[in-house]
Regions:
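Short, charged beta-turn/beta-strand-edge "cap" motif at the junction between a beta-strand
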Residues: 18-22
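Compact nucleic-acid interaction/catalytic patches
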Residues: 23-27, 32-67
Length: 121
């Protein structure tokens, strides 16, 4: 079944995460990394975690979001190398989108953690 709302690479969304005890939810930001064509044909969407807990020095794979306010975030935040899928219909809302500079950083982060796919052949 196709979905009507489609997100672009770099869109910042809010997802409901359950509390560790299983009662209640936390609303957390994440960034879309799946292609629109993937989303048109699937019920899920592929996301990468965003956190406002910034510890220096950053861990391997973490990247500071330079234009966090333009992305719709409330605080300075980082991209974390935690990839997950989420049911599209459960997304709460879109906050904004990463700037082109931050999208380039996201692209580099993905290459750092996933490697160069062309080199896999």
């Amino acid at each position: 079944m196709p979905f009507m709302t489609h997100y672009n690479f770099g869109d910042v969304v809010i997802v409901p995460f359950p509390f560790s005890g299983g009662i209640g939810i936390k609303k957390r930001p994440a960034v879309v990394i799946s292609h629109e064509q993937y989303q048109k044909n699937r019920h899920d969407i592929i996301l990468l975690a965003i956190s406002s807990r910034i510890r220096e020095p950053l861990d391997y794979g973490e990247v500071l979001i330079n234009d966090w306010q333009q992305a719709g975030l409330l605080k300075a935040s980082i991209l974390k190398p935690l990839i997950f899928t989420f049911e599209q219909k459960s997304l709460l809302m879109q906050l904004g989108s990463l700037t082109s500079t931050d999208k380039m950083q996201l692209d580099k982060l993905l290459k750092n953690i996933m490697g160069d796919f062309e080199a896999w052949h």
